[in-house]
Regions:
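N-terminal membrane topogenesis motif
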Residues: 1-56, 94-97, 101-112, 139-142, ...
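Short runs within selected transmembrane alpha-helices of multi-pass transporters and secretion channels
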Residues: 28, 51-55, 59, 78-81, ...
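Interfacial/gating helices of multi-pass transporter permease domains
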Residues: 57-85, 142-143, 235-240, 244, ...
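Transmembrane helical elements of multi-pass membrane transporters/channels
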Residues: 40-55, 202-205, 209, 213, ...
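Transmembrane alpha-helical segments of multi-pass transport proteins
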Residues: 3, 10-22, 124, 390-394, ...
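Helix-loop junctions and terminal segments of transmembrane helices
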Residues: 87-104, 166-167, 277, 281-325, ...
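Interhelical loop/hinge segments that connect adjacent transmembrane helices in multipass membrane
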Residues: 14, 18-33, 172, 215-260, ...
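Alpha-helical transmembrane segments of multi-pass membrane transport and lipid-handling proteins
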Residues: 2-25, 56, 112-137, 142-146, ...
Length: 517
């Protein structure tokens, strides 16, 4: 009798079972999910502001310590590894976040699948390094690709810990990890660039950031995997993740085809100008999307059976993002010259027209990318794959169409095609089922266009009036002046005004809640 009881306790010890349950249960989040979403968003926005400052400093410092060809060389390799990196996650982080109930055995098996597949990808990447160097006609690519292949394994071992923290809406912890890891990577890159390590500073930044994220995720999460087990019911999760992974691969392949084509046919220096112009605009926008993304997917996943609340939550987030992205893109277009020269320096003047065209791309791409919130929160992996495939083919076609004219031809073609072909396709697929319809997405997009028009006109007018002043003065005065004056114009329209008041109310409420504690 005693032996049987001991065996039962060993198989299912209550303390262990209770401890494991803490990592997976989400029922306690539903009672105040709105407050958690706003509070989490507030914390994450603060972290992104800190990360934005870091990235601004990194862009300014590294652009002066390194040459365009250094960024171009690493950009060549990242164009390839970014596509392979998708499979290190296999879409299994979203599978863990989106699932209503999940077990220790399931997450354990997902962890080992991530690690095993990541190791395989690292070996494959290392094997392909010499061929990639031949493709680019640059022998330096081999060593860079070998070094960056290490990040596959690091990322694979981080996926499930990050997913569990997101599932539990532990946004402050995620924010601290994100900023701290980025700061360490940036610091190392600056030291190495200053010491003359050239492009290796950028490689070290990638590896250091990923390694720090791994260490901090493991320490913060507290979750530890067991050995793999059979019959855990993990097959549906892997199936869902496979669709997401394929969709992400198609998306990454199309998104990085420009870097691959430009690196192959035009070399490292033109690609360096292109990637810096792209990153200078895309990174701040990504840091705007990231806090909303981190908060909204878990929230929408919990609301997937409440159509009215789901649609309302999504469209409010859409309106807030449209307001910010349109205003930011318009301001950047009017300030293209002073922005590039102040942040990157005079030797990057060739990036000014590229940066200006990327602001046109920014009108449509972020607001098509966030359709992934719909697919991931509703478990529509097949639809996401269809979406990414159709949009990816259109994007690659735009790159090929503009390649003859070099970097400026590629980005101009992308801007036009994204707006008139890609966006309609994406909105049709996203809205053909579920609470959010295609008409909702178009209404959200078109009703917020006055934000872009108002801010651009007012900022451009300010630049024209102060054009005789230095670039720094134009940046410091014309940007805020154009944003304030433009806001006064677009607030005359009901939808932008509603989005602005909603966002302001949420921020005000979060501030009051935090300072009341």
């Amino acid at each position: 009798m005693s032996t049987n009881m001991d065996l039962a306790e060993m198989k299912d010890p209550a303390p262990v079972r209770e401890k494991e349950h803490e990592h997976f249960r989400t029922d306690h989040l539903l009672a105040n999910i709105g407050h958690r979403a706003v509070s989490g968003g507030f914390v994450t926005v603060g972290a992104q502001a800190a990360k934005f400052t870091l990235n601004f400093l990194a862009a300014a410092v590294l652009a002066r310590l390194l040459d365009p060809r250094d960024f171009g060389l690493v950009g060549m390799v990242l164009g390839v590894t970014a596509m392979v990196q998708v499979f290190s996650q296999l879409g299994l982080s979203i599978a863990t976040i989106q699932r209503e109930t999940i077990t220790q055995a399931q997450v354990t098996n997902l962890f080992w699948i991530n690690v095993g597949f990541s190791g395989t990808l690292a070996i494959l990447s290392a094997a392909l390094a010499p061929l990639t160097a031949k493709f680019y006609h640059d022998p330096r690519v081999t060593a860079v690709m070998l070094a960056l292949s290490v990040t596959f394994v690091i990322t694979g071992a981080t996926v499930q810990h990050q997913a569990l923290l997101t599932r539990q809406m532990r946004f402050p912890a995620l924010a601290v990890i994100d900023v701290t890891s980025a700061a360490i990577g940036f610091g190392l890159a600056c030291v190495m660039a200053w010491r003359g390590f050239a492009y290796w500073a950028l490689v070290a930044q990638q590896v250091a950031t990923a390694t720090c994220s791994l260490i901090f995720m493991w320490l913060t999460s507290g979750w530890r995997p067991n050995l793999p087990s059979r019959n855990s019911g993990v097959k549906p999760l892997v199936s869902f993740g496979a669709h997401l992974s394929l969709a992400d691969f198609v998306g990454q392949f199309s998104a990085n085809s420009d870097s691959i084509l430009l690196g192959r046919f035009f070399g490292a220096s033109p690609l360096g100008l292109y990637t810096r112009a792209q990153v200078l605009l895309a990174r701040p926008i990504q840091q705007i999307i990231t806090p909303i993304n981190n908060v909204l997917i878990p929230v929408l996943s919990r609301l997937q059976h409440d159509a009215d609340r789901y649609r309302r939550s999504y469209m409010r987030a859409y309106g807030t993002l449209a307001l910010i992205v349109f205003s930011f893109a318009a301001m950047c277009l009017a300030l293209s010259k002073p922005l590039v020269l102040v942040i990157l320096g005079p030797k990057w003047a060739g990036a000014i027209p590229l940066f200006a065209m990327f602001t046109i791309v920014a009108i449509s791409q972020p607001l098509s990318a966030i359709c992934s919130w719909i697919y991931e929160s509703q478990g529509r992996g097949k639809d996401q794959l269809t979406n990414h495939t159709a949009a990816g083919l259109v994007t690659i076609a735009s790159f090929v169409l503009g390649l003859h004219w070099g970097p400026i031809g590629v980005v101009t073609s992308l801007a036009v095609v994204s707006l008139i072909i890609r966006l309609p396709i994406v909105y049709y697929i996203a809205g053909r089922s579920g609470p959010v319809k295609t008409s909702d997405l178009w209404m959200g997009f078109l009703s917020h266009l006055p934000c872009w028009v108002g801010v651009f006109l007012m900022t451009a007018l300010a630049v024209r009036l102060l054009g005789h002043h230095s670039n720094l003065v134009q940046l410091l005065i014309c940007g805020p002046a154009g944003l304030i004056a433009g806001s006064a114009l677009f607030l005359l329209f009901p939808r932008p005004r509603e989005s602005a008041f909603f966002a302001a109310g949420k921020v005000s409420g979060a501030l009051k809640t935090r300072f009341a504690k």
